[in-house]
Amino acid sequence: VLIIAVLFLTACQLTTAVTSSRGEQKHRALRSTDKKFKVALLCSPPGSYCFGPAACCSNFCSTLSDVCQESWSG
């Protein structure tokens, strides 16, 4: 009876460990997509006002019109 109880408790601990590690993986995945979303919000899309290339998602800010460009047009 003691051996069965020990095996049962060991199985419960292993099941709990596997379940909690899966939960952590899901949370890690959510955190990484959250970071990407926040970075996307920090840059300005093409056609919007910019104050330097770092402000634009494309890294191209027209110095004449202060507007984000899709790409550099020579």
Swiss-Prot record:
Record's keyword annotation contains Oxidoreductase: no
Disulfide bond residue pairs: C43-C57, C50-C61, C56-C68
Any single Gene Ontology cellular-component annotation: extracellular region
Pfam families xrefs: Conotoxin
Coiled coil residues, start to end: none
Tissue and organ expression note: Expressed by the venom duct.
Signal peptide segment: 1-17
Recorded family membership: Belongs to the conotoxin O1 superfamily.
Domain notes from UniProt: The presence of a 'disulfide through disulfide knot' structurally defines this protein as a knottin. The cysteine framework is VI/VII (C-C-CC-C-C).
UniProt-recorded name of the protein: Conotoxin AbVIA
Native source species: Conus abbreviatus (Abbreviated cone)
